[in-house]
Amino acid sequence: MKSLINNLNEVVFGKLNIRQVQIFFIQISLISFILTGLTRCSTNNKHANSTELPDYKVKLEVVIKHWDGEFNWTQARVASIPGIGKNGQPRLIMTMQKWFVAHSDYYSGLYTMQSDDMGATWTDPAEQPPLGWRYRKDSVIVGICDITPGWHAPTGKLLALGHTVYYKKGGGQLLEQRPRSTAYAVYDPKKDQWLPWNQLKMPDDYKFFNSGSGCGQWLVQDDGKLLIPAYFKAKNDTSNCYSSTVLHCSFDGNQLTYEKHGEELSWNVPRGLYEPSLTVFRGRYYLTLRNDIKAYVTVSDDAMHWQAIKPWVFDNGLEIGSYNTQQHWAVHKNCLFLVYTRRGANNDHIPRSRAPLFMAAVDPERLLVLKETERVLIPERGVMMGNFGVSTITKEETWVTVGENMYPPENLDMGADGSVFAARIIW
């Protein structure tokens, strides 16, 4: 603490360089987070979900860490299988991939970790060959990425959803136009076995030439049908703008089948509307959408017909400042929350302002983020944390999981070590 006070004096009197100032404020942020300890969310805002917001605690844990200059773990998301862990606890399955940092978005096949004691212990990351790369005769590698796992109670299976991706033999993505599709894989907990990943067949190969459900939260309805947010572009479309929709699908425990899709939401601003995430709250469906310039939201009564999209803004009228990255939902029985990154948090040194991770309550009628409820869930340590997941684990816990993407290299002295974090929100 004494050294921090000395540093504060040096900040005030201009004796520190820019990098030292950045590190100083990160130290302050981390200490503030630790001292806060238990994060509480309460407000008397009369518009806040028409009820008092729930108190909650946040327990921040490191699941695993890895950084060797070649890869870090990324796209870490977790799903809960009820009742088959120790003493009736759920079994947690975390899916993640290696990001080979020499290339942009260059990911391994899928790995999984497992916990039967609510995260007290985890198995080591296990490569799953059925979820790995497939090598074609033309030296092209086809993989799957941006996976979100979830439990399908009617069939007793875990379903992992994402999309396909193409890589060069020597590394890196193939950027020329190729068909992309929603990919899925099935885990049978009784056999402790993954089936080989498959691709969802769409009704129009031309229209949905470049489509997928990357990084999105999806829903299982009471009748077992799935609502899967997806984004797409037609073949030969050079607009650099995706459209988003919600796919209505059936699942028999082995095969995922398209049935219909809702309104197609478009926006003629690079790169359109993509990486949508879906949730349901009090019988209404909420969709948050990524755009390069700002984030958008819309609502529906049937997941087919949607209100006009609107930018995400705080209840004070200012835009929340989330851009060119995803947002996700956290749902309490009495309250709807948004998890996001944003600019304006002393984080200009982070590409796309992709850290820290914030959570705040949402007014579900006005579609506003309640600024006074905003909290930092996972502090930033100089690197990006954009590819995160939010999962309902039990009625009492929701988890936000993310791996530190060790980029940019000039910030690697600011505390990041390739940790995969789990922020346990305890309601």
Where are these regions (language model features)?
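Charged/polar low-complexity intrinsically disordered segments
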Residues: 20-22, 27, 118
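N-terminal secretory signal peptides that target proteins for export/translocation
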Residues: 1-21
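Low-complexity, intrinsically disordered segments with a bias for serine/threonine
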Residues: 7, 33-36, 46
